[in-house]
């Protein structure tokens, strides 16, 4: 593994342990050249997923982008980072188990909303406002009604 500090190819694993409920291996590494220390995660990748955008454009699935979506929705919210990581890992597992290599942004968005609903109501509303492209205050009222279990009014 290349050192992120000095780009040396010669790094050493100092410690390995299971992470994310056994779904990954966390490795603590050290660079003998510059003395830098860093952590890497090793995960199983069942298949190469491709995201189909609303425009029809296809891009490789990016787990980090999914994680950033959670971070943006949860900004300044007090949610345990381990719960967020478990939610992201759960979504990736669901996507891989769909049996399809191509996944629509709509499918991903629905899974994110479902996960956020159980993590934090405010983050759920934030994400929904972007995902559903809210245009007026009534859109917020509708999603708040969903959270309270009220029937949707048309």
From Swiss-Prot:
Protein's UniProt keywords contain Cytoplasm: no
Cofactor(s) annotated in UniProt: Zn(2+)
Entry annotated with the keyword Phosphoprotein: no
Domain ATP-cone residue range list: 49-139
Superkingdom, taxonomy of origin: Bacteria
Keywords: ATP-binding, DNA-binding, Metal-binding, Nucleotide-binding, Repressor, Transcription, Transcription regulation, Zinc, Zinc-finger
Cofactor binding, per record: Binds 1 zinc ion.
unnamed zinc finger segments: 3-34
Entry-linked InterPro entries: ATP-cone_dom, NrdR-like_N, RNR_NrdR-like
One GO biological process term: negative regulation of DNA-templated transcription
GO molecular function: ATP binding; DNA binding; zinc ion binding
Similarity comment: family membership: Belongs to the NrdR family.
Function description: Negatively regulates transcription of bacterial ribonucleotide reductase nrd genes and operons by binding to NrdR-boxes.
Protein name: Transcriptional repressor NrdR
Species this chain originates from: Chelativorans sp. (strain BNC1)
Protein encoded by which gene: nrdR
